[in-house]
Structures are given as C-alpha cells and as structure tokens.
Amino acid sequence: MKINEIPTPFYIIYEDRLRRNLELINRVKREAGVNIIMAFKANALWRTFPIIKEYCTASTASSLNEMNLALDCLGNEVHSYCPAYTPLTINLYLDGSSHITFNSLNQW
C-alpha cells in the first residue's frame, strides 16, 4: 500500500527512533538510579506498548480504564491517582494499583 492510499488521519511510528529514545530514557534511569513511569497522557498508542514494556517498569493511571490498560498491556506496577475516589472505586484501585496518590489528607 502506498502512503497516499492510507486513510487519514494516521500516525507513523518509527520503531528505530522510538527505541533510541527509550534507550536514552533507560540510560538516565540506570545512571540516576530512578524509576521511569510511563504516562498514558504522553503516549496512548497501545501498539507501541510491547516495545515500551521492554524499557519501562511502571505506568500511571488516572482512571480505572487506564489502570486496566496498564495491567493488561504492560503488566507492570501501576501508580494511580484520581480527583475523587468513591467507596466502590477505591477498592478497585486498591486491587489493581501498586501505588495510589491522594490529592489531600481529607481524601484519605
């Protein structure tokens, strides 16, 4: 298929460039002794997740859907945050998250 035959809009991901950037991030991770957390807000292109999974060991989730996506596609630790937790959702977040951030002590 020629590029002008592909329906638009579309995204082109150059795997070599993605890997080069992930290698740089991985180097920073090693040299600084930190953990890199992938944010779905920065990249929601789920077809890249198998590659990202090779480099990132954690991800963020600002919703239950993002938490489930992280668990299903990345299978790593999930750092969750939410503007408001309900009695129902807090238990779901507790079951699927490795870390939970609260906006205030009152939210606890």
Residue ranges and their predicted role:
Residues 1-13:
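Generic N-terminal amphipathic, Lys/Arg-enriched alpha-helix
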